[in-house]
C-alpha cells in the first residue's frame, strides 16, 4: 500500500487543497531534495504547510501564493504535481532503505575493510581467548565509521550544494541568506527578493511584511482559568476575540469600493509559557495586518468577506485537528513556523 494518500477519508470535499503523506516520505523529500519542492512552489505559486498530523502521517495544506490573479486550476494542478513528487520520493526512499539494509548486512558479515575476503572458508583458528585492547596494553580501536551514503544520494547531495534552486544551474557568485543559510546565485536571489522578501526555499521572511487586513479591527484578549483544553488541563485558557465592523474595500483589496460585512472570530490558546509566546506573536501579526485578508470564504464560497490569512488558529476547544481544536500536540510549534514564514519571530 502506498504511503501517499490523496486525502483523509473524513475530510470530504473541503480538503481539495490538502494531501496526506507518511512522515518518513515527507521528511525524506524535504531534507534530501528540497530543490524539487522549491521548484514546485515557484512553478505553481503555492505554499505548502503542515496543517495537522498523527503519529505516522502529516496533513499538508496547499495555499495560493503571490500576487493575484491565481492561475486557473492552480491548486488542482499543484496538488497533482505534489502527489507525483511524493510518489517519486517514496520510491527513492524504499530504494535507499534497501541499499542501506544490504550495506548493513555486508558490514556485519565482513568484519573488515574487504568483506569479499570473508565470504567463504572456515573461520580462523584462535589460540586463546582475545582480551580487551586495554588489557593487552594497546589503545582501544577507533569507533567504526558510519556506512557511506548510497552513491546516487551522495551525488545528488553534492549536486544540490552546487546547484542554484532558482535557475537550477551551477551557482554563480554564491549568496547565502543570513537566517536560513540557503545559497543561490547572487543575481537570482537579488531578483527574487525584489518580488518577495522571503527565501524561495523555506519561505523565511527577510524584512517586515505588512498585509491588507482591514485597519478597523480589534484584537481582544482575556483569560479563563476554568476553561481547560485537552492536553493542557493544568493550565487555563487564553481566549482571543477578533472583531471587525463592516467596511469598504480599499485599493489594496481585490475589489476596491465594494463593501464587506463585519465579523467576529474567537480562538483559543493554552495559558502556558509556549501559549503565551504564541499570543505575543499573534499580536505582532495582527499589528502588521497579516492575520486576516479579504477574499472568498473557503467554507461558504462567499466573495468579498474577511477570511483567515494562512495563520492557523484553534477556533474550537475540542475535536482535534479535524475540527480545528485540541488535542493537537504539535500545533504550537507549527503555527510558529507559519508565523516565521511571514517574518513574525520573537527576536
UniProtKB/Swiss-Prot annotation:
A zinc finger (RING-type) spans 164-205. Disulfide bonds: none annotated. Residues 113-157 are annotated as: Disordered. The keyword Metal-binding applies. It catalyses: S-ubiquitinyl-[E2 ubiquitin-conjugating enzyme]-L-cysteine + [acceptor protein]-L-lysine = [E2 ubiquitin-conjugating enzyme]-L-cysteine + N(6)-ubiquitinyl-[acceptor protein]-L-lysine. GO terms for cellular component: cytoplasm; nucleoplasm. Residues 121-151 have a biased composition (Pro residues). Belongs to the Deltex family. Keywords: Cytoplasm, Metal-binding, Notch signaling pathway, Transferase, Ubl conjugation pathway, Zinc, Zinc-finger. GO terms for biological process: Notch signaling pathway; protein ubiquitination. This is Probable E3 ubiquitin-protein ligase DTX3. One of its GO terms (molecular function) is zinc ion binding. Pathway: Protein modification; protein ubiquitination. Its EC number is 2.3.2.27. Homodimer. May form a heterodimers with other members of the Deltex family. Interacts with NOTCH1. Regulator of Notch signaling, a signaling pathway involved in cell-cell communications that regulates a broad spectrum of cell-fate determinations. Probably acts both as a positive and negative regulator of Notch, depending on the developmental and cell context. Functions as an ubiquitin ligase protein in vitro, suggesting that it may regulate the Notch pathway via some ubiquitin ligase activity. The lineage of its organism: Eukaryota, Metazoa, Chordata, Craniata, Vertebrata.
